[in-house]
């Protein structure tokens, strides 16, 4: 074993995590370690079954003493034979790095920051917030959970985030990976997990699955149309199309949504539905409502349609309702849609009375879920839901749409 490098690695690690490395002001207590404490080096040094380890370590210590990089305190009466403590000499720290073949931590940090620099002006706030925290942590000599040795990995992350912010439409994961990296699996195997960790920590919306997190930034497992059913006229490339002519509704692909113009909504109201089963049951029995399936949090193509619908409603007001799960996620989805698209959005069958009627079919939740509901209860942004949240906390159950559909039919 290269004991010289091992000794210096331990000492330099202690130095890099010290106040001295951060402030430049030398502490009276130099970076050091003791062979009396339990660690890998002391285990080898004090191995009575293999005395050669001590001889090799002593040889390494004496060479480093000769080069003035370290100072050694020997056991009493055992000078040059049994070491007790090893100290790093401040004046010879640069030589210690060179001798060990180790790149200084500060240089690694600076290189990572240079790689991450484009994220300082990224259009997504959670990305900018993460970059800012990394920058501040580095200034305080903390790594902020950054792998300083994985420069390539962060280069790939920056490349992915830079391309994602410019996406107008959603894109299948493997198509995106091939387009950006020339490898259909690289995003999923190398970048996805790191991106999700950052997004979950700094994003302002808490999704229920990795799939939903990725969909919210435009990454899909597969392309999905937007399902819509109602008596609405649209125009695409100059041609008028009456969607009311399709009794089972219609699936709009991204390119169609991009080019369509909403001409007229003949229905008396609009209902956004979170769950597919509920959507299908509702379109069977209602003929004067425009239904749109959101599939949980609206994906990019759903968002594009909702934006166009919102523009139409500015001059042709029609009531808009959202029908979602009676749980933490359902509340979040409602508030997101209200905040982003329809300020007058109203909930449908998401009240205390509906909850009480179907709570016996609900799913129990644990302490972590309860804590999230309690935070909502403390936030006035969710005041519309406080009575429902109190009821959920009392019953310790959440009610999904499928339960309501199944027990009403």
UniProtKB/Swiss-Prot annotation:
What Gene3D superfamilies does the annotation carry?
A: 3.40.1360.10
GO cellular component assignments:
chromosome
The entry summarizes the disruption phenotype as follows:
When this gene is missing the Wadjet system does not confer plasmid-transformation resistance in B.subtilis.
Give the GO molecular function terms.
DNA binding
Gene behind the chain = jetD
Name of protein: Wadjet protein JetD
The entry's function note states: Component of antiplasmid transformation system Wadjet type I, composed of JetA, JetB, JetC and JetD. Expression of Wadjet type I in B.subtilis (strain BEST7003) reduces the transformation efficiency of plasmid pHCMC05.
